């Protein structure tokens, strides 16, 4: 289980590497990814996350991996700027209406509720077999 903010500097390097590693071993890993944007540090991450959810709900693949390729100022607050960069990188046409849909908001809120229930307060946070992995590297030791 991974909780991550797409604009967190450590997440940008960690998450794509970890996900790619785990994808190569589908018999060993089931990846559960939860969006956990840290709004106070990276306000732009909230809209980026909602855009990613909207695109996933439309059936797009590899959204999570590509999300970490979106380069936007973490402090950006103009939704049109955030969405334009997201759509450019993803080659998509997500709109503000998509971000505000009840389905997207429900999914987004659910991710935050799961994080809250597990007392996640930072990113990236990794649980391996139900145990918090503070090193974030134990996945490489799975046999």
Model-predicted segments: where are they?
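Typically the conserved alpha-helix immediately C-terminal to a functionally engaged Cys/Sec
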Residues: 4, 10-26, 37
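Cysteine-centric redox/oxidoreductase cores and disulfide-bonded domains
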Residues: 38-123, 127-143
